[in-house]
């Protein structure tokens, strides 16, 4: 057990120590504010305070983890043996920066609570992040890299210290705002959409609609079980998320009033544990969100613990507080829609730290490093290269690679290409 002395144990410090030591390093670490207990401890130990107690392993503390305010921070990048970092420390410290404060700043999404310019959907823009100030930083899981470099420093200081190894994992997050392209629509809707296709000379779409609706061919978007088999053979987990809501002209989704759509979701749920995709309208109406979640749980006869927020609209802290209130356990929305990279600078799932309430919440956040929106304009070869590059970063720290794809993107690229992409990163 690694003992960490600090002059004050705070929720912020406890949160970041758990992530760095337990989740990434695989080590048991405990905090103490007792000098006597620290001196008596015979095992590996370090001090996180303004001054060292003796000549022990020492990291000089930044005030960020002992404060309750949310205010702008001075971020100045430097290099630590090829890894960018900030919150630089002087030579008295055993490592050149405050790894705890820097990690907390990124994991808690501290910068998203500060004044910033949002995009058209009210989202935090990647260009606003401190990670965009350092070239290449956003495409590296810095928190994991920092933790492993701290681990190396501790092994050097305490030979024989034990750490549990972890395994590299790949998860595919499949989002389906509109679960089908043609199936389960009303006759009037088919007629209306057919006239639109005809007016725009989209004869291929007209043919596909005819084959699906009249001849009973499989819907082009119905690729869920077809993708499940090859991914399972590669040891990759597939997490499908479906919208279950009223019809919305923007989403062009299938309404929850269609009983056949409900039967379809039950069928998929027999093979895969499906999650709830919060609709655009429900993002703006908490009451509607609760209704959608309740109706989908009633349909499947089980609680829904996994959620994706449509269009990565994780507006902190409100969006996550609403999930916590409904006892949602896992979120798969922490990423950028149109930028490849790590929004929270980690590839390790972590609990949501609520800066508004200063408490670690029971909501596990899965960082998404690549979304279909960022891949959409790229050709097959470029997509594969981009995925391999960022997957290698995750492999280097044995983290979790989360790739988010929509059913529309899968239909566009084809199952063969998607399988090829996943195989390249496994």
Features from the language model and the residues they span:
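Terminal accessory/targeting
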Residues: 1-256, 348-349, 355-426
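Catalytic domains of cell-wall/extracellular-matrix polysaccharide-remodeling enzymes
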Residues: 13, 281-359, 412-415
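Alpha-helical structural signal in soluble globular domains
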Residues: 20-24, 230, 267, 295, ...
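A local structural micro-motif
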Residues: 29-30, 238-239, 275, 305, ...
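Glycine-centered flexibility motif
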Residues: 136, 273-275, 339-343, 399
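Conserved, mostly hydrophobic/aromatic
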Residues: 175-177, 277, 307, 323, ...
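Metal-dependent polysaccharide deacetylase catalytic core of the NodB/CE4 family, i.e.
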Residues: 182, 204-205, 225-315, 407
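Residues at the C-termini of beta-strands that transition into short coil/loop
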Residues: 278, 334, 367-370
């Amino acid at each position: 057990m690694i003992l960490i002395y600090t002059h004050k144990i705070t929720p912020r410090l406890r949160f970041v120590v758990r992530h760095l030591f337990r989740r990434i390093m695989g080590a048991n670490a405990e905090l103490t504010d007792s000098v006597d207990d620290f001196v008596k401890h015979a095992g590996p130990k370090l001090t996180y305070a303004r001054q060292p107690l003796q000549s022990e392993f020492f990291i000089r503390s930044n005030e960020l983890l002992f404060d309750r305010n949310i205010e702008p921070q001075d971020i100045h990048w430097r290099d630590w043996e090829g890894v960018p970092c900030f919150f630089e420390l002087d030579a008295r410290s055993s490592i050149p920066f405050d790894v705890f404060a820097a990690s907390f700043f990124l994991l808690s999404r501290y910068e998203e609570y500060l004044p910033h310019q949002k995009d058209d959907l009210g989202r935090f823009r990647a260009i606003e992040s401190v990670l965009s100030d350092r070239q290449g930083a956003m495409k590296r899981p810095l928190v994991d890299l920092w933790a492993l470099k701290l681990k190396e420093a501790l092994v050097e200081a305490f030979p024989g210290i034990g750490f549990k190894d972890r395994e590299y994992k790949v998860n595919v997050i499949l989002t389906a705002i509109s679960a089908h392209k043609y199936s389960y629509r009303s006759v009037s809707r088919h007629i209306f959409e057919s006239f639109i296709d005809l007016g725009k000379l989209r004869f291929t779409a007209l043919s596909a609609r005819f084959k699906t609706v009249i001849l009973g061919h499989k819907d082009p978007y119905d690729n869920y079980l077809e993708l499940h088999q090859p991914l399972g053979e590669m040891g990759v987990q597939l997490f499908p998320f479906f919208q279950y809501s009223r019809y919305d002209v923007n989403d062009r989704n299938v309404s929850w009033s269609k009983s056949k759509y409900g039967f379809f979701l039950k069928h998929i749920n027999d093979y895969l544990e499906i999650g709830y995709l919060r609709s655009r309208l429900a993002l703006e109406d908490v009451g509607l969100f609760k209704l959608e979640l309740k109706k989908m749980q009633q349909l499947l006869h089980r609680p829904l613990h996994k959620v994706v927020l449509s269009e990565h609209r994780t507006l902190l802290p409100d969006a996550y507080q609403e999930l916590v209130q409904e006892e949602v356990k896992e979120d798969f929305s922490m990423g950028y829609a149109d930028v490849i990279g790590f929004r929270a600078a980690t590839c390790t799932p972590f609990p949501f730290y609520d800066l508004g309430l200063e408490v670690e919440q029971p909501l596990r956040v899965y960082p998404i490093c690549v979304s279909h929106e960022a891949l959409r304009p790229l050709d097959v070869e470029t997509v594969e290269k981009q995925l391999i590059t960022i997957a290698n970063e995750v492999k280097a720290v044995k983290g979790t690679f989360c790739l988010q794809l929509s059913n529309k993107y899968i239909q566009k690229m084809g199952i063969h290409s998607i399988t090829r992409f996943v195989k390249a990163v496994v």
